[in-house]
Amino acid sequence: MARSNQTARKATGGKAPHFAMRVWQHSTPPLKKPYRYKPGTVALREIRKYQKTTDLVIRKLPFQRLVKEIAQSLKADLRFQTGAVSALQEAAEAFMVGMFEDTNLCAMHAKRSTIMPKDIQLAKRLRGDRV
C-alpha cells in the first residue's frame, strides 16, 4: 500500500472538552443496583430461621377461613371454638412438617436437592397413606 502524506487540518468538531464531561457526570447521582444474593442463600437463611422458631407458619385467619369453608361443605351451621381451630392448625402443620421431612429424604435418596411430586407420592406410599 502506498504511503500518503498527512496534512495539518483545522479542528472542526470532534470530542467535547473533558471538563464538560465531568460536570455532566456529577450532576446526577449514579443509580445503585440492588444487591442479589447467590441462588440458595436466602432459602438456607429461611430454613434456619423457621427451624429456630416454634411459631405457626400458616396465618391464623386464612387457616380459620379454610376450615370453615371445608366444614360448610360437610354440614351447614357448624361453629368452632378458638382452641379447636388452633389445635387443628397445630396438627395440620405438624403433619406437613413430617411430610416434607420424609419427602426431603426421598429426594436425597435420589441424589437430588429439589423435591418433586414423585417424592411426595413415594413418601405417602411409604407412610401407608393413600396416593
Curated annotation (Swiss-Prot):
Residue numbers carrying N6,N6,N6-trimethyllysine: 10, 32
Localisation per UniProt entry: Nucleus; Chromosome
PROSITE patterns: HISTONE_H3_2 (PS00959)
Modified residues (N6,N6-dimethyllysine): 10, 32
N6-acetyllysine modifications at: 10, 15
Tissue: Expressed in roots, seedlings, leaves buds and open flowers.
Keywords carried by this UniProt record: Acetylation, Chromosome, DNA-binding, Methylation, Nucleosome core, Nucleus, Phosphoprotein
InterPro entries: Histone-fold, Histone_H2A/H2B/H3, Histone_H3/CENP-A
Modification Phosphothreonine, positions: 12
GO cellular component labels: nucleosome; nucleus
Residues bearing PTM Phosphoserine: 27
Positions carrying N6-methyllysine: 10, 32
SUPFAM superfamilies given in the database record: Histone-fold
One GO MF term attached to the UniProt entry: DNA binding
Family: Belongs to the histone H3 family.
Subunit structure, interactors included: The nucleosome is a histone octamer containing two molecules each of H2A, H2B, H3 and H4 assembled in one H3-H4 heterotetramer and two H2A-H2B heterodimers. The octamer wraps approximately 147 bp of DNA.
UniProt function note: Core component of nucleosome. Nucleosomes wrap and compact DNA into chromatin, limiting DNA accessibility to the cellular machineries which require DNA as a template. Histones thereby play a central role in transcription regulation, DNA repair, DNA replication and chromosomal stability. DNA accessibility is regulated via a complex set of post-translational modifications of histones, also called histone code, and nucleosome remodeling.
Protein known as: Histone H3-like 4
Organism of origin: Arabidopsis thaliana
